[in-house]
């Protein structure tokens, strides 16, 4: 790889570190190509990506970034999983690590916060953006449906009372 290619890789990695909601770093020694392709496919499904890069170039790309201390995690055979959604990459990486013992999560970064393996696990346990939106919508919708039910209930009660009175008069 010549100098121009290295500079291009450093620039690409810098953009990844700036634009990603979360970056998860893991060791992948012993993971087969097929298993790595499976991980890449799972990441693509959630809008994330997986990148293997030279640790030295990644550390250069991290220089001056809020997540610069993540460079301490970049030793050995490392892979970076990242996504704009702050939870998606962590969820996929954590689930994949549970299935594959050779994929070991070292930590990661979420903005300027450096995560240890337990931190990545905590982030993975959080609901995704879509799940949070669904929860908020259901919370907002619940009172509205209760109000609609309360408004409709007296009318049905009055109708029931009137039908009972009619039955009594007819009898």
UniProtKB/Swiss-Prot annotation:
The UniProt record lists the keyword DNA repair: no
Sections of the chain in a coiled coil: none
Domain of life: Bacteria
GO MF terms held by the record: large ribosomal subunit rRNA binding; structural constituent of ribosome
GO aspect biological process, one term: translation
Classification via Pfam families: Ribosomal_L10
Entry keyword set: Ribonucleoprotein, Ribosomal protein, RNA-binding, rRNA-binding
Family: Belongs to the universal ribosomal protein uL10 family.
Function, as annotated: Forms part of the ribosomal stalk, playing a central role in the interaction of the ribosome with GTP-bound translation factors.
Assembly and oligomerization: Part of the ribosomal stalk of the 50S ribosomal subunit. The N-terminus interacts with L11 and the large rRNA to form the base of the stalk. The C-terminus forms an elongated spine to which L12 dimers bind in a sequential fashion forming a multimeric L10(L12)X complex.
Protein name as it appears in the record: Large ribosomal subunit protein uL10
Native source organism of the sequence: Cereibacter sphaeroides (strain ATCC 17025 / ATH 2.4.3) (Rhodobacter sphaeroides)
């Amino acid at each position: 790889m010549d100098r121009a290619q290295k500079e291009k890789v450093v620039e690409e990695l810098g953009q990844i570190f700036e634009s990603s909601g979360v970056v998860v770093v893991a060791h992948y020694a012993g993971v087969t190509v097929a298993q790595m392709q499976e991980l890449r496919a799972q990441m693509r499904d959630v809008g994330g990506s997986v990148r293997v890069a030279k640790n030295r170039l990644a550390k250069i790309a991290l220089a001056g970034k809020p997540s610069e201390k993540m460079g301490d995690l970049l030793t050995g055979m490392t892979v970076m999983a990242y996504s704009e959604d702050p939870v998606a990459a962590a969820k996929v990486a954590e689930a994949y690590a549970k299935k594959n013992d050779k994929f070991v999560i070292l930590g990661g970064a979420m903005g300027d916060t450096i995560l240890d393996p337990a931190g990545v696990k905590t982030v993975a346990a959080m609901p995704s953006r879509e799940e949070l939106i669904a929860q908020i919508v259901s919370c907002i919708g619940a009172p509205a449906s209760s109000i609609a039910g309360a408004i409709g209930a007296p009318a049905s009660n009055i109708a029931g009372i009137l039908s009972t009175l009619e039955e009594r008069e007819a009898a």
